[in-house]
Amino acid sequence: MIKVFNRKEKIYDIEKVAGDNYLKWIYSSPVGLNFLELMIKKKFFSKLYGKYCDSKHSAKKVSKFIDDFNINEKEFTLKKSDFKSFNDFFYRKLNNDARPIINDENILISPADGRLFAYENIDIHNLIQVKGLTYSLDELLKNIELAEKYIGGTCLLFRLAPVDYHRFHFIDDGICEEAVKISGSYYSVNPIALEKVPKLFCENKREYSIFHSKHFGDVLYVDVGATCVGSIIQTYTPNEYVVKGDEKGYFKFGGSTIILFFEKDKIIVDKDIVEQTQKGFECKVLMGEKIGTKL
């Protein structure tokens, strides 16, 4: 059971997990773990399933998925009957008023819909994956010099579940460098998997880019793929000026993760998010929602 803090209602919601029984079997049984290592974490499996999700045959899954997870159709730019494949639905666009952007330059917004952990004054050699499991930023980036720039900074970890809006956005005006791609495996990023696979984020396929933001310093975006995520698509143009709320990219089918790193003394994360992280609970956030302020 995954409990997520609802910031508006100030209560804990129980997350309904897509493929819950399947995930438990894969990551908790000897047979499932063997199947995971031999097939599921491999590129060919995600590529094969990705092709199915791109096909017109997968479109029949859309309506049931929306109903099962109570996803708000009113936010979509298309009717559910207009999606040509499951991926077409998965990386759907939303109406302009579905995720309003706070234009105040001192306000830090969420880059995506998801579940958020926040870590301040980070030790880049002992970043928290889950309680008891850590990884290092230089392992994640394979770039020690860049990693050291974020000593004592802030790490924001956004977990995107399959039910979420899967486009991600810029948190400020600025210029973003070209993404650096790092090949890897395709483990799930569900908490069930995070508790079982050491250094999972360093194992999975990922991309990172440096965003030279106008108000929050040099922000490091790390986009991590997961099981069945055939592609991480960057839709921005590198080294061209963007404005707060502009789209940066999207994930194809599967759960996925976005990790933001801020330099020391650049931001203050909202108190409730920090408190819930310390208690071991994620906070549910929407793209454009206030999550902190400029220091």
Curated annotation (Swiss-Prot):
The organism's place on the tree of life at top rank: Bacteria
Topology class, membrane: Peripheral membrane protein
GO MF: phosphatidylserine decarboxylase activity
Broad EC category: lyase
Catalytic activities: a 1,2-diacyl-sn-glycero-3-phospho-L-serine + H(+) = a 1,2-diacyl-sn-glycero-3-phosphoethanolamine + CO2
Active-site residues per Swiss-Prot or TrEMBL entry: 113, 169, 256
Modification note: Is synthesized initially as an inactive proenzyme. Formation of the active enzyme involves a self-maturation process in which the active site pyruvoyl group is generated from an internal serine residue via an autocatalytic post-translational modification. Two non-identical subunits are generated from the proenzyme in this reaction, and the pyruvate is formed at the N-terminus of the alpha chain, which is derived from the carboxyl end of the proenzyme.
Keywords in alphabetical order: Cell membrane, Decarboxylase, Lipid biosynthesis, Lipid metabolism, Lyase, Membrane, Phospholipid biosynthesis, Phospholipid metabolism, Pyruvate, Zymogen
Entry function: Catalyzes the formation of phosphatidylethanolamine (PtdEtn) from phosphatidylserine (PtdSer).
Description of how the protein assembles with itself and partners: Heterodimer of a large membrane-associated beta subunit and a small pyruvoyl-containing alpha subunit.
PANTHER family named among the record's database cross-references: PHOSPHATIDYLSERINE DECARBOXYLASE, PHOSPHATIDYLSERINE DECARBOXYLASE PROENZYME 2
Protein name: Phosphatidylserine decarboxylase proenzyme
Source species of the chain: Clostridium novyi (strain NT)
Gene that this polypeptide is encoded by: psd
